């Protein structure tokens, strides 16, 4: 492979052809970081952006950074946030409020992680200008015939305008992976089944939907309530819940990370779309009328009285099901999908502020907000970037999965770290067995700390093109991508792939043959963080399938009261465990129901993680065919079975005997923790 570059055909350049060392396609935050890094390493680079703005989501409304563990954000990414802080160090930056009134501005901090969209774009432009990066806007790849490949390498890419960009290396930093796909690189769309990569949080996820983003009240889905023959209201799929863990084509929902203002002098009322249709919001009205009075948005405050506004609750800014075709759609179809999302969200905001079927208390709350007059001034104060949370994902020789996020597998060729929750937004609304509406797809599980991202996951597999890297639509499962897909990580990977591209040029090697040691040395020199923070190490993954006997996880239990999921402890079954928060004593309980599958003596075991803050007097009730045993478990004490399970006793069972185990937090003197239940035949 190393001789391929030397044998590339020499092509004479026309007036419409630009030749550089590295072509970066996609002006996202990753694209900016990649282009800046190439130039700083002394090589020529062109950054091509299909739209009219650079920065992607970072300059498109996502100003409340999903940063995770900030210790693992280094290099160009950290420099960006340091520049943000320096901007807000200037008194002139504070126009609508005083810096002292904004709690997330702390002059002594190394960096600042919240910012206004226009400030982010300005900082990106400054970085590009200082690095002498040539930026070309409004140039879209000819996806049908625009990628020229020779000898297993991308030679040039042609835009719809006819302009040609040739290079020695190419980096696809789009959210959609258009260059990757057009170059014939293998990819996937949708959710894999858990069985594909040995995961627990992928695919269809009904049981995991225990957070805010669901219906808390019974809401009828039929046009005429109670009458299925009348048809469904808008935004509901005519299907049941499905089987957990099965894969499908669905994509987690998109929205606009809307910037709002409540400063009267800088506030524009929410516009009513010309094609407004109140029937799109029938579920919203019915949910309010059922008694759910939560304001269905999540506005996080940024400087100068503005927000980064995200989805929240049962029916909100996420447009479930409206994006399934987007990843592979034509440009024209994508534009239609974006307009549909814009109409949906603008209509939602106008509805919340104005419609008479919205409770007055909600309307009063919403009328204090509007769009900021000084943001997105060329787009009606509306964000120019749809939040494409996930589109195509490359399939390479290394696929980052839940195993990596949980550190049960640790990559040996790190080019950056992730640390945010494995976070999938809902993908659809279905009809429950009881005939009501519910959301599906929401998963929010902490990986329990930072994890390493493999170099092999940002380059194509061997046998595919040898000079294209993909730091955004990288090789990852759906649920792992839910953690990786944060803007700081995209910048980190953009810098790392740019460094690899430069080293491949200098060494005259394919990206797949690049020595990792040299790459690592340069990345560390340039401030990248490549190792786990102190105290983090490889974890043990314990699944139900890996344990003997009949095992029920906490997700299999019936809950009373509000329990909190956690992964803070080092050892647990499945995706985590539950705890009572050491609050609301006597108001929380958990109940498992199981049936014996064999006759004979069986030991019943309870899994929990011990700690000094745990309760010493957890009440557990075991009922076998109505015969009740009351137990007290000291969870300060480490479980005797593998440090994970404690015995709840041995019981003589017959096939089909009914067993009920109930755990309560009544009168407990610390945290009550519940992980799993195991029924084992006695030896």
Name each region found by the language model.
Residues 22-43:
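N-terminal Rossmann-like FAD-binding beta1-loop-alpha1 element of flavoenzymes
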Residues 121, 155, 163-169, 173-544:
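Flavin (FAD/FMN)-binding glycine-rich loop and adjacent Rossmann-like elements that form
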Residues 1-22, 41, 137:
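Extreme N-terminal leader/targeting segments of oxidoreductases
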Residues 146-164:
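Conserved beta-strand-loop-beta-strand element in the redox core of flavoprotein oxidoreductases
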Residues 20, 30, 59, 140-142, ...:
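Ligand-binding pocket scaffold of soluble enzyme catalytic domains
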Residues 43-44, 49-146, 188, 196-198, ...:
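Conserved N-terminal/central alpha/beta ligand/cofactor-binding core
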Residues 16-17, 39-41, 150, 247-251, ...:
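Extracellular/periplasmic catalytic domains that process cell-envelope and extracellular macromolecules
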Residues 541-683:
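Extracytoplasmic
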């Amino acid at each position: 492979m190393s001789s391929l570059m030397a044998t590339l055909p020499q092509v004479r350049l026309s007036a419409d052809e630009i030749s550089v060392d590295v072509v970066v396609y996609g002006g996202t935050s990753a694209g900016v970081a990649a282009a800046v890094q190439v130039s700083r390493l002394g090589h020529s680079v062109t950054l091509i952006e299909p739209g009219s703005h650079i920065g992607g989501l970072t300059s498109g409304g996502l100003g409340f950074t999903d940063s995770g563990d900030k210790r693992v954000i280094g290099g160009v990414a950290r420099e960006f946030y340091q520049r943000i802080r320096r901007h807000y160090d200037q008194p002139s930056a504070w126009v609508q409020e005083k810096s002292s009134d904004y709690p997330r501005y702390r002059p002594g901090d190394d960096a600042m992680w919240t910012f206004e969209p226009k400030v982010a774009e300005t900082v990106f432009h400054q970085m590009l200008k200082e690095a002498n990066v040539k930026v070309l806007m409004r140039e879209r790849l000819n996806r049908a015939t625009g990628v020229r490949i020779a000898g297993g390498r991308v030679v040039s890419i042609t835009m719809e305008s006819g302009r040609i960009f040739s290079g020695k290396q190419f980096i696809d930093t789009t959210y959609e992976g258009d260059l990757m796909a057009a170059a014939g690189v293998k990819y996937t769309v949708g959710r894999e089944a858990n069985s594909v990569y040995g995961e627990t949080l992928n695919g269809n996820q009904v049981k995991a939907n225990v957070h805010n983003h669901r219906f808390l009240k019974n809401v009828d889905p039929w046009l005429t309530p109670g009458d299925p023959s009348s048809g469904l209201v808008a935004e509901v799929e005519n299907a049941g819940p499905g089987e957990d863990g099965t894969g499908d084509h669905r994509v987690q929902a998109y929205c606009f990370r809307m910037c709002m203002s409540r400063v009267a002098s800088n506030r524009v009322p929410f516009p009513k779309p010309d094609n407004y249709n109140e029937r799109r919001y029938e579920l919203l009205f019915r949910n309010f009328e059922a008694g759910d009075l939560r304001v269905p948005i999540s506005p996080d405050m940024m400087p100068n009285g503005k927000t980064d506004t995200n989805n929240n609750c049962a029916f909100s800014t996420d447009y479930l099901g409206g994006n399934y075709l987007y990843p592979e759609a034509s440009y024209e179809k994508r534009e239609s999908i974006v307009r549909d999302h814009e109409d949906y969200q603008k209509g939602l905001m106008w509805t919340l502020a104005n419609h008479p079927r919205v409770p007055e208390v909600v309307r009063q709350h919403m009328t204090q907000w509007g769009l900021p007059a000084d943001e997105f001034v060329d787009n009606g104060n509306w964000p120019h970037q749809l939040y494409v949370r996930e589109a195509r994902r490359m399939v390479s020789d290394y696929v980052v999965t839940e195993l990596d996020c949980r550190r049960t597998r640790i990559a040996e060729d790190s080019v950056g770290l992730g640390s945010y929750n494995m976070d999938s937004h809902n993908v659809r609304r279905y009809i429950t067995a009881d005939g009501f509406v519910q959301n599906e797809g929401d998963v929010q599980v902490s990986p329990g700390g930072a994890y390493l991202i493999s170099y092999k996951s940002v380059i194509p597999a061997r046998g595919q093109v040898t000079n294209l890297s993909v730091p955004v639509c990288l090789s990852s499962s759906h649920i792992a991508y839910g953690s990786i897909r944060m803007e700081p990580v995209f910048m980190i990977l953009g810098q790392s792939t740019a460094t690899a591209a430069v080293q491949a040029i200098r060494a005259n090697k394919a990206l797949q043959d690049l020595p990792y040691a040299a790459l690592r040395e340069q990345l560390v020199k340039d401030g990248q963080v490549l190792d786990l923070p102190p105290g983090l190490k490889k974890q043990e993954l314990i699944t139900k399938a890996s344990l003997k006997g009949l095992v029920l996880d906490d997700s299999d239990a019936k809950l009373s009261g509000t329990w909190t999921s956690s992964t803070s402890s080092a050892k647990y079954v499945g995706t985590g465990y539950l705890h009572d928060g050491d609050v609301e004593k006597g108001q929380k309980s958990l109940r498992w129901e199981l049936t014996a599958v064999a006759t004979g003596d069986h030991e019943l075991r309870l899994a929990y993680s011990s700690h000094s803050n745990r309760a010493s007097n957890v009440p557990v009730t075991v009922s076998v065919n109505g015969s009740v045993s009351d137990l007290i478990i000291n969870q300060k004490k480490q479980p005797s079975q593998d440090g994970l399970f404690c015995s709840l006793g041995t019981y003589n069972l017959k096939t089909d005997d009914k067993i009920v185990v109930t755990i309560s937090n009544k009168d407990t003197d610390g945290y009550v923790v519940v992980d799993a239940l195991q029924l084992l035949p006695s030896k």
